[in-house]
Amino acid sequence: MSEPPVRDTTTATIAAKTAGMKHWDGFLPLDVDPKADRVLLEIPHDSARALLFVSLATGLGSNPIGLDRAADVGAYVARFDRSGNKVLLVLENWSYRSSSPNRDNARSVQESFPPSTVAALPIVGEDAGGRVLVDASDMVFRDWVHVSATLSDSKQGTYVLARDRSTVFAPYTKAFPKNTEIDASLTFALAGGAPGDIVSNILPDPTAITLRQHLSLMPLPDSGYEPRALDPRVGYFAVTFKDYGQPIQASLDQRWIGRHRLERVNPSDPKSPIRNPIVYYVDRGIPEPIRTAVKQGVSWWIKAFDDAGLTGAFRVEDLPDSVDPMDARYNVVMWENRNERGWSIGGSLGDPRTGEIIKGVARLDSHRERTDYNLYAGLMGAASSA
């Protein structure tokens, strides 16, 4: 029989280790250590789980490469497993599962497809009851977005993450009751050869590219949400997975549509108000008169929800000045500036287990409105009369 891992009983208490640091209480409390340029994260117990969202807070400004501001990169079910004097960050694999009540069948699936252990977080403090304080650097200063691979695939050069030129971005590193937000500036340095034409045209010095990467941690949603199968006649985003608990005559491939949760205060009353309406916040960086037009366009959804019997289920507002648009609690309509015209993209971050949308992200390219205006003006004869 193997012995359990040895734990260091001399580990400092959490209070002693974080004395004098900027503390944020919340879902996963955190402390920012400015001297060591690191984030210390409190894990409440062994095998604690959370939703983990990854986004780019700032962009490269190039449509062909695609590393854009507010790009939602990934949504994971994360688990923090203690192993000796460290905590392992494990990403659970929800692409393969079993709906069968047979627990052994579910176990066979779980043991057939691996999770991903992506970071080891040293324990630096510990309190009675299993609460530990970890140095989250291995999680924070990680190329979650695959910047290096994207630049290489785009033939822009071989870039590597330069830890000595990367730092915690403290203004947007905070914790709240329902979420913990961690922001970091990551610098990617040219490791050899010449930089590509695109980055050479955009960067003041193409041998170094600094982007901000944002991590959001939230509690797993409760079981009150009911997944809905994606109708193939509807072109929309979905959670796709293989369900090995399906009957022999059924397909393993399952698709659940991504959608927001809407619940009435009184579920038995079809006229009862909506408990938590969907609110989309419009980026204040959108210039007028475009911002007013965007708000008017988004507000068309109000009538659609009302006509569906969901009165008051949808609102649109300006993003408050004090709010970071990367904050996972806010659905946002973001303004993207690029060096050339590019795509406007609708996306979301949600629960990989069910398809429930937690944060909607609509990204508008700033060139498109100019292009549309020029097309309209040309058709109306404005170009010839100017």
What are these regions (language model features)?
Residues 287-291:
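Alpha-helix N-cap/helix-initiation motif
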